[in-house]
Amino acid sequence: MKLLFDFFPIILFFVVYKTTNDIVTATAALIPATAAQVAFSWFKYRKVEKMHLFALVIVVILGGATILFKDDTFIKWKPSVVCWLLAVVFLIGGWVSKKNLYQRMMEANISLPQHAWSKLNYSWVIFNTLLGALNLYVAYHYTQEQWVNFKLFGMLGLSLVFALMQGVYISRHMVEDEPAPSESATGNGDNKSF
């Protein structure tokens, strides 16, 4: 359900584009959908994920420019701007604190050695940098319709494959919690034999 919630604005953008074949109309649907996502999160949970708020600001600025100038260049840059800013946040996050951003987000759920946290964090930097570049390549070398398809299916598909690869990496490097000593091992249990 959370995945659908996170991708609701882009799915709506895709559907509106496919039904109208007009990127300005699709962008005009994307802006309020992103705002509704933020508002829903606030009213339901009394908090807004920073990523959703960040996406709203970028969508309003670049989407607004797309609508104002009737130029799809701005909205085509939006995924790249988001990816590159995320890469910068992941990169700088480790420099300003003892723990990198990925570790701070995930350490409550999993335990990994420090080198694994670092590799995961840097892999997000590299992935987002490359995904942002790939988005612009598709935007400038393919048709608008192909870019819209890539924005939903290509970027989402690559993100899911990357997340699965991260899951495999994590499973290979997880630190097992020490099992609690059993009572018989500590000598505290009843050792009755019949």
Curated annotation (Swiss-Prot):
It comes from the Bacteria. The keyword Cell membrane applies. The chain crosses the membrane at residues 1-21, 49-69, 77-97, 120-140, 150-170. It is found in: Cell inner membrane. Keywords: Cell inner membrane, Cell membrane, Membrane, Transmembrane, Transmembrane helix. Pfam families: IspA. InterPro entries: YciB. One of its GO terms (cellular component) is plasma membrane. It is a multi-pass membrane protein. PANTHER family: INNER MEMBRANE-SPANNING PROTEIN YCIB, INTRACELLULAR SEPTATION PROTEIN A-RELATED. Plays a role in cell envelope biogenesis, maintenance of cell envelope integrity and membrane homeostasis. Belongs to the YciB family. HAMAP family: YciB. This is Inner membrane-spanning protein YciB.
